[in-house]
Amino acid sequence: FKNGTFQLLNYDEGETDMGDGTTWRNLLKYGRELDEGYYMMVTGTRLASGAVLSNSTFFTIEPGKTTTVDLVMRESKDQVQVIGNFNSEATYRPVDSTEQRSILQTCGRGYFVVAVLGVGQEPTNHALRDIAALGNDFEQWGRKMVFLFPSEKQYKKFNADEFKGLPSTITYGIDVDDSIRKEIVQAMNLNNSILPVFIIADTFNRVVFVSQGYTIGLGEQLMKVVHGL
């Protein structure tokens, strides 16, 4: 607060993949040295609707003293929140093609589901049965679902007939070099060795749902988010 008004503190964006930039770790984890004075800290949680839940905290920095301020991120119990990012132009290879294509090319504009499956693993089988049980609901939603396998070998072991009712909106593909799984795991801070992984995201690269491993009622969880979009 200076000369009767609050002035924005600016920080170099840097290269986040090189450990620099305006990340929580670099800016806040270990604290920062600030000039003495009166400050306002504003945080925001972005919702899928585009609205932002904001919170303002006011505090004073005194000379030679450490000031601890809680970082408050508001949450909504009723509205879908943006929880991460996913590059919708990430590519995979459809099982009926020799050419790679992007998620965006497959799904078009709007929301979509991307999953990386572990063939023959009970968590994946359970998830697919949950989705098949609500196949009609996913059909009515009408958006694309891209289900990926870590390799061609794993895909050949997959038998969709074991999961009667899976929606026709599913496109199957190969996650070449595990690139999509790696991106999701890194962006959402997940365990790289656990499958399946499911996300709901959109072509603005916003993730609004993520699930990894064994999950009870995955189909219902997905549809709850879908109905909130």
Predicted regions and their residues:
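Short, acidic Ser/Thr/Gly-rich low-complexity loop/linker segments typical of extracellular
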Residues: 1-29
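Short hydrophobic alpha-helix segments
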Residues: 10-12, 56, 209-211
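Short Pro-Gly-centered beta-turn/loop motif in secreted/extracellular proteins
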Residues: 22-40, 45-48
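Structured interaction patches on ligand/partner-binding surfaces of diverse proteins
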Residues: 44-74
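Pro/Ala/Gly-rich low-complexity, hydrophilic intrinsically disordered segments
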Residues: 65-97
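Thiol/disulfide oxidoreductase modules built on the thioredoxin-like
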Residues: 166, 176-225
